[in-house]
Structures are given as structure tokens and as C-alpha cells.
Amino acid sequence: KDLFARYGKLLILAGGSNTVFKDSSFEGCVLRVCNKGIEVLEEDENEIVLRVAAGEVWREFVLWACKKNYCGLENLAAIYGTVGAAPVQNIGAYGAQVADYIEWVESFDMSNGEIKRFYAKDCQFDYRFSRWKKDNKNELICYVAFRLKKAFTPQLSYSAINQSISEEEAKNLTAERMCEIITEI
């Protein structure tokens, strides 16, 4: 709120990797999301729910999860950006989309200073779409909670994946190895 009052315009960047500025192109304050942290909220023998800060690098988070055998996000391992940007676009690749693993998204409403929590059913997820691509430009995503499995079930529906592994390797595939394969493709 204070930044908005001071500068009038705010531009929120995640990593900023797809953004180029000319010196005179934006009159306002550029805010980069840099919060970090991964917290276990729930865990049982089958699943884990993680609260992940929006400023975490997406790829690093996915690799971390795969190394711990927290499964589901493997096919999204090669996507660049941050955790907070992932629900905005409902990122997806190789037969997976992030919406299938999101429990909730927590955001800061810059117009009134409120923290809001949106459960997956309220995020309006669709193909490369969410509520944040529509009318909710005043909301800054702060945290995303993911529900991941502890048993790995590979998603091998894309031919590029099948062509990258042998039948024998497919039988012994791990989440971590799947991340490597996706990154190599």
C-alpha cells in the first residue's frame, strides 16, 4: 500500500527473465518477489502438503521435491520462473499442469492490505489460465501450497518422453530421473 501511495504504479515481477525495459518505459515502482522457504504443513505415508514461498525458483523447487521423492511435478521440471508465477499461468508440460497439485494459493491484496487464501477450486484454473490472469492484478501471490504424492507414477503419455527412455528404464524410473529426462528433452 505504501509503495502504491508513493509511486502510483506498481509492476510485479517474478524472476523477470522475460522482461526488458527501456529507461523511459515505466514510471513507477518495480517490485520483485524474493521471499524464500519451504514448510511441511501435513504429511502421512502417502502424501505431503508443502507451503512454498512465491520467490522460490520453480525448477529448484521441483528438483528438491523429486530428490525427496515428493512426486507429481516431474514433468514440469524444465519450466523457468518462480513458484508464485506458476499458478498465474497454470504452467504445464508433457501432460501435467500445476493446478492438479495446488492445494491453495495465498496472496496479498495490495488495494486493501488483506491476505487472502484461495483454494484450488476458487482459482479458476483452466488451460494456461487462472484468476490472476483476469481481473485480479492487485493481488501479489505470496505462498502456494502443493499436495504431492510419495509414490512415483510416471506420466509417459508424450512421445518425446517415450523416445528418451528404454523399456527397461521405464520399469525402474524414479521421480528424480524423470526430472533429468524432462530437462534433457
What is each model feature region?
Residues 33, 107, 146-148:
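Hydrophobic side chains in beta-strands
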Residues 19, 115-185:
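Phosphate/pyrophosphate- and phosphate-bearing ligand-binding catalytic cores of soluble enzymes
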Residues 1-101, 109-111:
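Anion-binding (especially nucleotide phosphate/pyrophosphate-binding) glycine-rich loop
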